[in-house]
């Protein structure tokens, strides 16, 4: 099993896309993958296209492990309705995804870090598990003593991202309410995500 990448720049380079739409992505400077000159491009197979769609979605949410990601797919497929839409809804209820959407932090990786370090409360109680599943109506906030962290202050003042409609935010108190699990069209992905191809990958 290969080592999981935990660097946003390394993931961008591996996939060849600016996954989070960040100005400092190495993809903005060149159009080839890792290595001195990248790899010669070939027409991808159906499998390759499906695999890339899966890797993009996994990578976007902080390079979730294959074991965890497959469990999300299995849960999505067991629910009523469209499996691809269900998968997006599940991923967007992860606590690290919600904290990232709230603009409390600049990246999903830093979101995971401040959660693991105990800086986040859900309904007034500390939650230190990044994969914790947020429910409709949950209130997520930064601990009062942690609100002056430079990382958090800079992220809250940034104009790089917008807060989606399925979260209401009190920026002054670094507090937000999760209104509902979104559909694909509601999620502000900076690159095209194709969860339908992820479903095809696992359905082979």
From Swiss-Prot:
What does the entry list under GO cellular component?
A: small ribosomal subunit
Q: What are the residue boundaries of the S4 RNA-binding domain, all occurrences included?
A: 93-156
A molecular-function term among this protein's GO annotations: structural constituent of ribosome
* Domain of life where this protein originates: Bacteria
Keywords, A to Z, come to: Ribonucleoprotein, Ribosomal protein, RNA-binding, rRNA-binding
Ranges where the record places region Disordered: 20-46
Record flagged with keyword Ribosomal protein: yes
> Which PROSITE patterns does the entry link to?
RIBOSOMAL_S4 (PS00632), S4 (PS50889)
Q: Tell me, what is an example of a GO biological process annotation in this record?
A: translation
Q: Record's InterPro entries?
A: Ribosomal_uS4, Ribosomal_uS4_bac-type, Ribosomal_uS4_CS, Ribosomal_uS4_N, S4_RNA-bd, S4_RNA-bd_sf
Biased composition range(s): Basic and acidic residues? 28-38
Subunit arrangement? Part of the 30S ribosomal subunit. Contacts protein S5. The interaction surface between S4 and S5 is involved in control of translational fidelity.
| Protein role | One of the primary rRNA binding proteins, it binds directly to 16S rRNA where it nucleates assembly of the body of the 30S subunit.
Q: Which HAMAP family match?
A: Ribosomal_uS4_B
Name the family the entry cites: Belongs to the universal ribosomal protein uS4 family.
Protein name per its UniProtKB record: Small ribosomal subunit protein uS4
Per the UniProt record, the source organism is Rhodospirillum rubrum (strain ATCC 11170 / ATH 1.1.1 / DSM 467 / LMG 4362 / NCIMB 8255 / S1)
Gene label: rpsD
């Amino acid at each position: 099993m290969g080592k999981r990448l935990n660097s946003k720049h390394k993931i961008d380079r591996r996939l060849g896309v600016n996954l989070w739409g960040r100005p400092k992505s190495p993809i903005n400077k060149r159009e080839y993958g890792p290595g001195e000159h990248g790899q010669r491009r070939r027409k991808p197979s159906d499998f390759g296209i499906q695999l890339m769609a899966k890797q993009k979605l996994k990578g976007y949410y902080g390079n979730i492990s294959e074991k965890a990601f497959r469990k999300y797919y299995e849960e999505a497929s067991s629910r009523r309705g469209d499996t691809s839409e269900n998968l997006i809804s599940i991923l967007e209820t992860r606590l690290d995804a919600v904290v990232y959407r709230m603009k409390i932090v600049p990246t999903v990786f830093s979101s995971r870090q401040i959660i693991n370090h105990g800086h986040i409360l859900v309904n007034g109680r500390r939650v230190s598990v990044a994969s914790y599943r947020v429910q409709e109506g949950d209130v997520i906030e930064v601990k009062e003593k942690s609100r002056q962290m430079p990382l958090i202050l800079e992220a809250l003042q940034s104009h790089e991202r917008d807060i989606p409609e399925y979260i209401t935010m009190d920026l002054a108190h670094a507090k937000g309410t999760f209104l509902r699990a979104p559909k694909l069209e509601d999620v502000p992905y900076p690159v095209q995500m194709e969860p339908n191809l992820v479903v095809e990958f696992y359905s082979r």
